[in-house]
Amino acid sequence: NSEAALFGISELLVNGVEHGNLGLSYEEKSQLALNNCWKSEVDRRSAHPDNLGKRVRLSFRRESHQITLRIADEGRGFAWRNYLELDPRRASEPNGRGIALSRMLSFSSIHYEGCGNFAVATIAPLNCQ
């Protein structure tokens, strides 16, 4: 399902920019979203000289049995295992569900390498067609 794959890929790319390259914490994003100033803060941080050259890189490999996506950002990483499952404590928060939803709807598997700034996601055969 290309729409489901696109959802997951978009989620990982946006996370790489916001949380990785721009250093926006979960708590900061929650507050900014609740105060309707999230986009202006992302724009402000994106324009900061320290962030101008930062990139999120996506590569993929299609094989007969799966597609493997590799997404890397230039951030400090994060405790990604905390976000693989939907957490009822975050159910009413404006953010914090994207990785779990991506894992459920878009990918056969997802994990992070290194400090958490390198995601590896796979799409299984049923989703490759």
What are these regions, as identified by a protein language model?
Residues 4, 8, 98:
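Conserved N-box helix within the HATPase_c
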Residues 11, 15:
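Conserved polar catalytic motif of the HATPase_c/GHKL fold
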Residues 65-70, 76-78, 83, 88-92, ...:
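Flexible, glycine-/charge-rich segments associated with ATP-binding catalytic modules
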Residues 16-20:
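Short helix-loop "hinge" at the ATP-lid/N-box region of the Bergerat-fold HATPase_c
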Residues 25-96:
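Glycine-rich/acidic phosphate-handling loop/turn and adjacent ATP-lid/helix
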Residues 10, 61, 124:
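Short loop/turn motifs enriched for small/polar and acidic residues
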Residues 23, 30-31, 120, 128:
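Residue-level signal for alpha-helical context at structural boundaries
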